[in-house]
Amino acid sequence: MVICVDRVRKKTDKFLDTIYKSNPKNEYLKSDTIDVSVKTPRVVRGITRIDLIKQFLDNNIDFYYIDTGYMGCYPKKLWHRFTKNNFQTLDHLNYKQLDFLTDINLLKKRFRKIMMVDYDSYKPKRPVEGDSILIIPPSAKVLRCLTVMKHTDFTQEQYIDYITKEIRKYTDKRIVVRQKPNRDERTRSGQNLKDQLKRDKVHCLVAFNSIAAFEAIQEGYPAITLGPNCANFLAKTELNDIEKPYFADDDKIREHSLYLSACQFNIEEFRNGYAMKQVEQLQHHPTYNRYKKVII
C-alpha cells in the first residue's frame, strides 16, 4: 500500500493517478503537507515536490520518486525512472544478479524497446580524445532542492566559477558550459546533448547530478560525477584525472545500462503493478543519500 500525493491543483497527475488505481489498497490525495503520524510510504513526481520530500525524510517515511527516465526519452518521454528514497538509482546490479532476481528475458525485451538494439548485440562506443571539457551545472530547480535539503548553499554562477578554477588546476583544455535547454530544444536536432558532444569535440563531461553524465558515457564520452548520480558506477568523482579520464569497460557499461533500463517504466507498467514490483526487487531497500554538504 502507498499514498500518492499530488500537487494542489485542478489537474490530476496521470502517473500518480495510475499508481493509485493499480491497487485497491492505495490512496490518493492532493496536499503540500503530510500527516506525520501515518508512516505509509508516499509516491510523488518531480523535483518541485522537494519540500514534501524533506518532510518524508525528517519523519522517517519511505517515498517513491518519479521523474524522466535514464534513456529512450527522445523524441517522446515514454519512460520514467521510479526510485525508492532517492531521486535517481544510485546502486548497481550486474547481469547475474538481475538474472537471479527477475525475468532476464523480459528485461532484454524491454531493453530493445528502449535502446532500439538487442542487449546481446549492444556494443558500447569507445572514447576518443577530444579538446574540450563540457560542464553541466545543476539547474535552478536542482539547486533549490539541494538548498532545501541543506546539501549546498551556492548559486549556479558560483558553482561554474569554482568548477572552472578547479578544472584549470589539471588541464588547459577549452571549457564549455551547457545550460539545461527546455525539452523542445533538447529534442531538436543540433540542440541535444549528443550533437553538442560531437560539435565541441568533448574530451570529458563534468556533471553534478545530471543524467547527461550517463548519456555521455553511452555515447562514448568520459564523465566525472561530483554528486549523487545514476552514472556514479561508471565514472570517477574527482577532477584530478580529467586529462586522462577513466572510462568503464564494455561489460560495465552494458550491465549498468541494462540495470537502469530495469529501473524505468512506461505508463502501462505503472498501471499493471510491474513498476512497483521491480523497484522492490531491484533497488535493495535504499536509504536516502545524505551526503556531506558541499561548500564553495
Model-predicted regions and their roles:
Residues 8-11, 48-50, 69-72, 138-142, ...:
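Short, solvent-exposed loop/turn segments at secondary-structure junctions
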Residues 24-79:
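Extended catalytic core of nucleotide-activated donor transferases of GT-like folds
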Residues 1-47, 141-142, 284-296:
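N-terminal pre-catalytic "stem/leader" segment of glycosyltransferase-like enzymes
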Residues 127-184:
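Conserved catalytic-core segment of nucleotide-activated headgroup transferases in glycan assembly
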Residues 31-36, 165-223:
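Donor nucleotide-activated moiety binding/catalytic core segment of transferases
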Residues 79-130, 234-296:
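Leloir-type glycosyltransferase catalytic cores
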Residues 45, 65-68, 178, 208, ...:
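Generic beta-sheet signal
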Residues 40-41, 132, 203-204:
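Structural motif
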